[in-house]
Amino acid sequence: MFDAFTLVVSQADTRGEMLSTAQIDALSQMVAESNKYLDAVNYIT
């Protein structure tokens, strides 16, 4: 997950731009999906 954040921020920095709302939303969605996965794993174990 850290790599995805690093990639998005690095690309925006290279272009000299701030992160767009769409990029922030996509990263937030990725975190939400990861949390669902972790919740399922914790439930099983």
UniProtKB/Swiss-Prot annotation:
It is a peripheral membrane protein. This is C-phycocyanin beta subunit. Heterodimer of an alpha and a beta subunit. The hererodimer further assembles into trimers and the trimers into hexamers. SUPFAM superfamilies: Globin-like. Keywords: Antenna complex, Bile pigment, Chromophore, Electron transport, Membrane, Photosynthesis, Phycobilisome, Thylakoid, Transport. Spirulina fusiformis, is used as a source of protein and vitamin supplement in drinks. In cell culture induces a urokinase-type plasminogen activator; may therefore be useful in dissolving blood clots. One of its GO terms (cellular component) is phycobilisome. Light-harvesting photosynthetic bile pigment-protein from the phycobiliprotein complex (phycobilisome, PBS). Phycocyanin is the major phycobiliprotein in the PBS rod. Disulfide bonds: none annotated. Contains two covalently linked bilin chromophores.
